[in-house]
């Protein structure tokens, strides 16, 4: 379906935004995939931006807040997710200035440790390192969490 119909594109865009927030780029891609032309999409994106319904900064903040609450992740994973959704690098940098990934790493580690109680200390440490690394936390943050949770063998000099 190829459609230059801006009102149709606006209706579809509002439907998508009613489900959840989107970045400008993400919404553009979905409208293009639906079959609307680039010429029909551009005015819709501009109008939604002027109305405040489409704001990459607010969208990025919402992603970070949601991720922090639901499934704590490190900076690396947050950056990758925001890039994938089309948020500009300048906005990502600005949003991450206040991001406390060390505290989130500690919280994620504490929660995960509850499911690792039956394992040996060495296995717990290894599993926790892999888990936190997969969540996008950096090595220093992981080691800090291991030290805080008093896991023997969490040595700064040993790589993961």
Curated annotation (Swiss-Prot):
Subcellular location: Cytoplasm
Pfam families: RecX_HTH1, RecX_HTH2, RecX_HTH3
GO cellular component: cytoplasm
Segments passing through the bilayer: none
Principal location listed in the UniProt entry: cytoplasm
Domain of life according to the entry: Bacteria
Record's keyword terms, sorted: Cytoplasm
GO biological process, one term: regulation of DNA repair
Described purpose of this protein according to its UniProt entry: Modulates RecA activity.
Family, similarity comment: Belongs to the RecX family.
Protein name (database record): Regulatory protein RecX
Organism listed in the record: Pelodictyon phaeoclathratiforme (strain DSM 5477 / BU-1)
């Amino acid at each position: 379906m190829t459609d230059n119909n801006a009102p149709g594109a606006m209706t579809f865009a509002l439907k998508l935004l009613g489900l959840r927030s989107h970045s400008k780029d993400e919404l553009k891609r979905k409208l293009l995939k639906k079959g609307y032309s680039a010429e029909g999409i551009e005015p819709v994106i501009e109008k939604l931006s002027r109305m405040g319904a489409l704001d990459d900064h607010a969208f990025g903040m919402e992603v970070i807040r949601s991720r922090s609450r639901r499934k704590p992740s490190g900076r690396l994973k947050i950056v990758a997710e925001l890039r994938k959704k089309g948020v500009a690098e300048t906005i990502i940098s600005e949003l991450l200035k206040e991001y406390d990934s060390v505290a989130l790493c500690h919280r994620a580690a504490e929660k995960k440790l509850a499911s690792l109680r039956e394992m040996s200390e060495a296995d717990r440490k290894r599993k926790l390192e892999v888990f936190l690394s997969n969540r996008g936390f950096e090595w220093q943050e992981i080691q800090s969490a291991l030290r805080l949770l008093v896991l023997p063998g969490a040595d700064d000099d040993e790589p993961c």
